[in-house]
Amino acid sequence: MSIRPNWQAATLLQAEETSITSAHTGRTYRIQAAALGERPAGGYPVLYILDGDAFFPAILNMAQSLLINPITKSHAACLIVGIGYTGGTIRDLSQRALDYTPPLPDNAPESERKQYGQADRFSRFINDELSALLDSKYRIDTQNQAVFGHSFGALYGLYSLFTRPERFRHYLLVSPSIWWQDRRVLDWLPDTLPQGIGIRLGAGEHEGRNNRPDQTSSGMVAQAKILAGTLHHLGADVRFTLYPNANHGNAPFYALTDCIEYLRNVWQR
């Protein structure tokens, strides 16, 4: 007897996806979402995952296991949302560079403006369009949101923290590209931060040995450590973690467990 397997595309349990074209950025986004636990009266807390095409599957699988209270066995309620692109790649380098980088200086050449500097537009997409879409389907708590970002995604997280810190309550940022444009993001570093915001910064041990010309060897790790200290002096709830044996590519996966366990502690009821 011959067997002819009927191969089909794999699916993620509990996950759904759609696409949305933003009027603010002009780009089309692949949105993956999964609602876990019983929805609270005030709506689901939300974890936004930047580079969602790369990280949503891993974070969802970990959250399904690690967001469970070990005593009550109840699942911390949350909506996990991956923000990606529709081009079919793990990372769309050109689109993420536009979305995740802060505004360029006024004298920046037009060639750079075509590649970078649209973080404000991307923020309006999240605030005005994506949040409304999610709320209409799931009902969300817009006062209790978190963001996970890596590299340029973490740079976007820092820019949001510095300019509109109330946009998210929890910032989970790994290997932030503070070096970009001669550390331009630090131009927005505030004098104070609101109470009640949690910041978790991380980097891989081997990122401190980076020899790329656009990232000095002292950049990724040392600058993240220095920034954590600065934010601490501003009164922020901040913690920096250095992941042994991790490099820029795998550091976010080392950090995922810490990020999910942090959210379990703040979101568990």
Predicted regions and their residues:
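A conserved short beta-strand
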Residues: 166-178, 198
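A domain-start/cap signature at the N-terminus of enzymes
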Residues: 1-45, 79
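The feature captures the conserved acid-bearing segment of alpha/beta-hydrolase catalytic domains
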Residues: 179-246
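Alpha/beta-hydrolase fold nucleophile elbow
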Residues: 139-150, 171
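Structural cue for short, hydrophobic secondary-structure segments
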Residues: 49-51, 82
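Conserved acidic catalytic loop of the alpha/beta-hydrolase fold
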Residues: 124-142
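Active-site machinery of serine-nucleophile hydrolases
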Residues: 56-123
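Short glycine-enriched nucleophile-adjacent loop
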Residues: 154-165
